[in-house]
């Protein structure tokens, strides 16, 4: 049996396919049907069954129907026609792959994307051409899985999508049924970049573990010593990744350096000591007096353009030693206490923010004078370009471990 499946294999209709079709706008579906029929990429398969009991031969003309769909016809009626009359034997495997990629690219279906960076100790390693990458990946998958691949280019962003469906090569059952979500992998290769976008890998899943091994071997074949390391960024918005980690990434808040130069930000969040800068009194006065002009300037400098940084979840772990050894008297007292353990005096505080657009929400809160844009730490303004952060004594630390499973609720 061939390990790579053809795109012309038919998948039986079920509720998942109908649910996927319902995500699309009416006109978008009609346009797709016309394209499938005219280009004969996924032609109607109703000819394989007897249609005499359902439609007359004159009535069954899919191309003429989809070119002139009555305006009064509802989307559900069009979907019914697709499933019952034109593709009654099931959609093709490539047809479903195209639908899923289009739904993700146009935002009809949302999915949490994350990213990993190709790390090499000696030099930067850029991912190869997507077609070359796919062929190398196929060679790694052949001995382990029965698989299907689909590659497509995003219409506006510099991203090439690769969709993979994996089955166990020893037990390739249910090839004609809609695959489980655990069997489907989405990859996104950005142009001239060393960052790989992908869906979130699940912990303790054999299929996901084997797929990660295939990716690791592929990178080693490209350049010995290369490995994937996770980037702590999770978002449903692909533009966010192009802005933060792509080759066209933007310096989102360059004006913030005017504030950093005053030493007003990135201090410990629990530090109660006064700011000792001599020339920052005017900025603090403007902040406390709610000076709208200076506040708005600070907000724009700190947040930049948040429209290209859409985050729906922000997870921050704060690690801080609240015992300050500022005086000799304090040091003597602490040395005399035998039970004192510095590691026990570091509380971990996990802060999680959720919403449709977190950064825009924080920006509005600053405008309402509920937060101070002058002293707000950088991990709350999007300047770090991350959505999962570990902050130790006010400093954002990045993970250095190799790629592993990342299951995020």
UniProtKB/Swiss-Prot annotation:
**Gene3D superfamilies from the xrefs?**
3.10.20.720
> What InterPro entries does this protein's entry cite?
Chl4/mis15/CENP-N
**The keyword Cell cycle is assigned to this record:** yes
Q: Which UniProt keywords apply?
A: Cell cycle, Cell division, Chromosome, Mitosis, Nucleus
Name its cellular compartments.
Answer: Nucleus; Chromosome
Q: Which domain of life is it from?
A: Eukaryota
Pfam families given for it?
CENP-N (PF05238)
Locate the transmembrane regions by residue number.
Answer: none
Gene Ontology CC annotations of this record: condensed chromosome, centromeric region; kinetochore; Mis6-Sim4 complex; nucleus
In the record, biological process GO terms are:
cell division; CENP-A containing chromatin assembly; chromosome segregation
* Primary residence: nucleus
- Record family assignment: Belongs to the CENP-N/CHL4 family.
Assembly and partners? Component of the inner kinetochore constitutive centromere-associated network (CCAN) (also known as central kinetochore Sim4 complex in fission yeast), which is composed of at least cnl2, cnp3, cnp20, fta1, fta2, fta3, fta4, fta6, fta7, mal2, mhf1, mhf2, mis6, mis15, mis17, sim4 and wip1. Interacts with mis6 and mis17.
Functionally, this protein is described as follows:
Component of the kinetochore, a multiprotein complex that assembles on centromeric DNA and attaches chromosomes to spindle microtubules, mediating chromosome segregation and sister chromatid segregation during meiosis and mitosis. Component of the inner kinetochore constitutive centromere-associated network (CCAN), which serves as a structural platform for outer kinetochore assembly. Has a role in the formation and/or maintenance of specialized chromatin at the centromere.
| Protein name according to UniProt | Inner kinetochore subunit mis15
């Amino acid at each position: 049996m061939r390990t790579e499946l053809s795109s012309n294999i038919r998948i039986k209709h079920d509720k998942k396919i109908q649910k996927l079709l319902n995500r699309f706008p009416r006109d978008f579906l009609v346009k797709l049907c016309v394209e499938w029929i005219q280009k004969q990429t996924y032609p109607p398969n109703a000819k394989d069954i007897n249609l005499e009991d359902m439609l007359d031969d004159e009535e069954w003309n899919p191309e003429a129907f989809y070119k002139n769909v009555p305006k009064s016809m509802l989307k559900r009626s069009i979907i019914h026609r697709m499933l019952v009359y034109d593709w009654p034997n099931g959609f093709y495997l490539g047809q479903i792959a195209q639908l899923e990629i289009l739904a993700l690219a146009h935002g009809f279906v949302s999915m949490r994307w994350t990213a990993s960076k190709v790390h090499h100790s000696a030099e930067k390693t850029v991912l190869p051409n997507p077609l070359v990458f796919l062929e190398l990946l196929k060679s790694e998958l052949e001995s382990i899985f029965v698989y299907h691949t689909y590659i497509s280019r995003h219409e506006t962003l510099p991203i090439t999508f690769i969709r993979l469906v994996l089955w166990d090569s020893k037990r390739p059952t249910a090839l004609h049924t809609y695959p489980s979500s655990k069997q489907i992998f989405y990859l996104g290769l950005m142009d001239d970049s060393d960052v790989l976008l992908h869906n979130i890998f699940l912990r303790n899943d054999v299929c996901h573990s084997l797929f990660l091994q295939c990716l690791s071997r592929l990178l080693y074949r490209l350049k010995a010593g290369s490995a994937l390391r996770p980037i702590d960024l999770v978002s449903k918005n692909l533009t966010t990744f192009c802005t933060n980690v792509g080759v066209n990434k933007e310096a989102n808040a360059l004006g913030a350096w005017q504030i950093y130069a005053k030493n007003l930000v990135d201090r410990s969040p629990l530090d109660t000591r006064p700011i000792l800068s001599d020339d920052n009194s005017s900025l603090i006065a403007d902040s406390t007096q709610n000076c709208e002009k200076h506040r708005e300037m600070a907000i724009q400098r700190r947040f930049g353009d948040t429209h290209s940084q859409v985050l729906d979840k922000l997870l921050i772990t704060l690690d801080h030693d609240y015992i300050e050894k500022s005086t000799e008297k304090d040091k003597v007292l602490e040395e005399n206490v035998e039970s004192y353990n510095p590691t026990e005096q570091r509380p971990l505080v996990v802060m999680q923010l959720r919403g449709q657009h977190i950064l825009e929400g924080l920006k509005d809160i600053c405008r309402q004078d509920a937060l101070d844009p002058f002293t707000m730490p950088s991990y709350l303004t999007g300047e770090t370009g991350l959505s999962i952060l570990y902050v130790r004594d006010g400093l954002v630390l990045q993970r250095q471990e190799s790629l592993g499973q990342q299951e995020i609720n």
